A protein has these predicted regions:
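Residue-level recognition of single "structural anchor" positions
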Residues: 1-239
């Protein structure tokens, strides 16, 4: 049998007794200082619930399924998703600057189809992946034209734009945006974009809004962006 010892949160005394309940949670009263409180404070319970919500968001669960699993209100889950849409800290370099100058990196680029609201409203996810470390170093959402790709290219750090070979498929937007002397377009089946295509599959397994035939789709671009950001951040953290 396991016995749990509780102490007063104010004076630290072990002489406490049960004193009713509040919203289904047992209360206690300290016989030394007469302080009343909960054995498990609400902040601790909410922190555990929010940690569970954050874990479920990165495991292909919809908002309503998380409500059924955790009992957390759907509006609270939506607030957690919007909070996760804040800018992420930059990825730390895995090698020194001197080592980066000696050896060129290899980046793989690809685009991933998704939709917002209805299937006719297409939104493409553009990814930039380091081949050696298999981490996502850049991404953006938009159409399949040149504008989102140009925005993504300009947002990449300078050492990626100057000292990298760029392997892509033969989609026409890449040839118009990427530098010709760095760009290496490859036909389907060549295997030069196998890493980024495998990461596309991993993201579809982790993020429900990227699944082709799913009821877990986003109704707004802001929520769509936030859900994808959660999936990408969690993927990079697992490397």
């Amino acid at each position: 049998m396991v016995h749990t010892q509780h102490f007063c949160a104010k004076c630290g005394s072990a002489s406490i007794r049960r004193n009713g309940s509040k919203k289904g949670q047992p209360k206690y009263q300290c016989t030394a200082c007469r302080y009343q409180g909960l054995f498990v404070p609400a902040a601790v319970r909410k922190a555990a619930q929010y940690a569970q919500v954050d874990a479920l968001l990165s495991e292909r669960n919809s908002q309503r399924s998380i409500v059924r699993l955790t009992g957390v209100a759907r509006m609270t889950i939506a607030k957690r998703i919007k909070k996760a849409a804040l800018p992420s800290p930059p990825l730390p370099p895995r090698r020194s600057t001197k080592a980066q100058r000696k050896r060129w990196e290899v980046l793989e680029l690809d685009e991933l189809w998704s939709f917002v609201g209805r299937r006719k409203r297409k939104v493409w996810l553009w990814l930039v992946v380091e081949r050696a470390r298999r981490r996502i170093v850049g991404w953006t959402l938009g159409s399949r034209g040149e504008a989102p790709l140009r925005k993504l290219w300009q947002a990449l750090p300078a050492h990626y734009r100057r000292h990298c070979w760029l392997f892509t498929d033969q989609w026409k937007a890449y040839a118009k945006v990427l530098p010709r002397w760095q760009h290496r377009p490859c036909p389907k089946g060549a295997g030069q974009t196998s890493i980024v295509e495998a990461i596309n599959c991993s993201l579809r397994q982790r993020c429900g809004v990227l699944v082709r035939k799913s009821c877990s789709f986003s109704k707004s671009l802001a929520m769509h962006t936030a859900r994808i950001k959660i999936g990408i951040d969690n993927y990079n953290l697992t490397l």
